[in-house]
C-alpha cells in the first residue's frame, strides 16, 4: 500500500483531514457539515423531543376528565402529534441515508465505522481517556471524533431503526389489516412475541434514546468548551473552527 493510500485510510478512520489538521496553525476553519445534514440534525432533534414527550403521555396518560369524550380530545391531540413526529423522524432518517451517498465524505461518517482499522480503535481509546479525565488534551478532528462515530451508529442509528420498526408495527395495528403500515411492519409483532411485548420494547427504547440524547448534549457542550475544535456552532454554520 502506498504512503498516500495509507494516509487516506488512517484519515478516514480517525477523522483527521489532511487539508485542515495536518497543515497545523495555517488552517483555522474548514467546511464539514452541509446544509442537509444540519437541517436533518435540528429537525430530528425536535422530532425526538415531541416523540419522547407525547410517547410518555401515551404510556402514562393523564387522569380521566369529566364530560363528553368529544369535548376532551387531549389524548387525540397527543397521539396525532406523536404520529406526525414519527413520520418526520422516519422520513428524515431515509433522507439522511440518501445524503450519505450524495453528500461529502463527512456525511458518511454516521454510517461508516472502520471497526477493523487499528488506528480507529487507538483514537477511540484516546477519546475515552479524555472523557474520563485521564488525559489533558484530546486529538483534533474535523468530522465526528471516533468515539462519537461509534456511538452515533451503534447506539443512535440502530436504536432509531428499532423504534421506527416497532412504532410503525403498532401503528399498523390501529390502521387495521390491509393497511400499508400493517403489510410492511406487521411482521415485527410476532417476531418480538405479541403486541404488548412490542409496546414494552418501544417504551424502553424511548428511555434508551432519552439517555443517549442527554449524554450526547453533555459530550457536545463539554467538547465545545474543553476540546480543541468547535462542536455546537459547527452544527449551525457547518464550519469546524480550531482553537489551536
Curated annotation (Swiss-Prot):
Free-text function comment from the UniProt entry: Probable b-type cytochrome.
Recorded source organism is Cupriavidus necator (strain ATCC 17699 / DSM 428 / KCTC 22496 / NCIMB 10442 / H16 / Stanier 337) (Ralstonia eutropha)
For this protein, the record's InterPro entries field holds:
Cyt_b561_bac/Ni-Hgenase, Di-haem_cyt_TM, Hydrogenase_cytochrome, Ni-dep_Hydgase_cyt-B
Q: Domain of life, per the record?
A: Bacteria
Residue stretches spanning the membrane:
39-59, 73-93, 150-171, 204-221
Q: Where in the cell is it found?
A: Cell membrane
Q: How does it sit in the membrane?
A: Multi-pass membrane protein
Family that this chain belongs to: Belongs to the HupC/HyaC/HydC family.
What are the entry keywords? Cell membrane, Electron transport, Heme, Iron, Membrane, Metal-binding, Plasmid, Transmembrane, Transmembrane helix, Transport
The lineage, from the top, is:
Bacteria, Pseudomonadati, Pseudomonadota, Betaproteobacteria, Burkholderiales
Give the Gene Ontology MF terms in alphabetical order. Answer: electron transfer activity; heme binding; iron ion binding
PROSITE patterns named among the record's database cross-references: NI_HGENASE_CYTB_1, NI_HGENASE_CYTB_2
Q: Which GO terms describe its cellular component?
A: plasma membrane
Q: Please give the name of this protein.
A: Probable Ni/Fe-hydrogenase B-type cytochrome subunit
Any Gene Ontology biological process:
respiratory electron transport chain
* Signal peptide location: none
